[in-house]
Amino acid sequence: MTDRSRRVHDDSIIIDGAFTNFSVPIPPTESVPDMMLDHIIDGGVTAVCHSLIADPFPMSAEEALMTLYDESIVFDAFPDKTVQILTAQDIEDAKAAGKLGIIFATQGMASIGTNMRYIWVYHKLGVRVMQLTYNERSALGCGCKEPVDTGLTRFGEQAVEQMNALGIVLDLSHCGVRTSLEAIAHSQAPAIFSHASVRALNG
């Protein structure tokens, strides 16, 4: 790496948009998670979107809430290395402090069922990025593997509105094209594709 490249890297805010391989044992121990944190921080990563709830591993809302609680242990276990990201300013503060910012995220929203209140509860527990669907059709819209994308449902529209109101970032990775475009059109805030490829390059 050239000196200029190193300076750009060191000065940049770098966010891993789909991090899924971190967990802290209960009770916490100074072992693999500690080593992983060191590698990530040494690599210059500012923050990671930690996908705690993912539709490929189905869980009830109760199980999802317990997962959020359990994963919060990381902040108590490694207070000198981690900080929970709740606002954009927290990301800048993590960069300045040399700590790893952890953004709680979901890949899919099947765990909320058809109960909009869980979005509010997840937000209270620190979730700041929520992915609308995961590959398949849900109560909110269609995933990218559905042969026919019927678009954003009315419940999906309400979910987007709730996320906008709470300040949760709308993630459209794994979503179908029509569902994604309709969600973008309906949202009052920017959406992201935290982990996706460019169709023109990847077919």
Show the residue positions of the predicted features.
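N-terminal hydrophobic targeting/anchoring segments and the immediately downstream early-domain regions
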Residues: 1-149, 154, 199-203
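Active-site core of metal-dependent hydrolases
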Residues: 132, 136-203
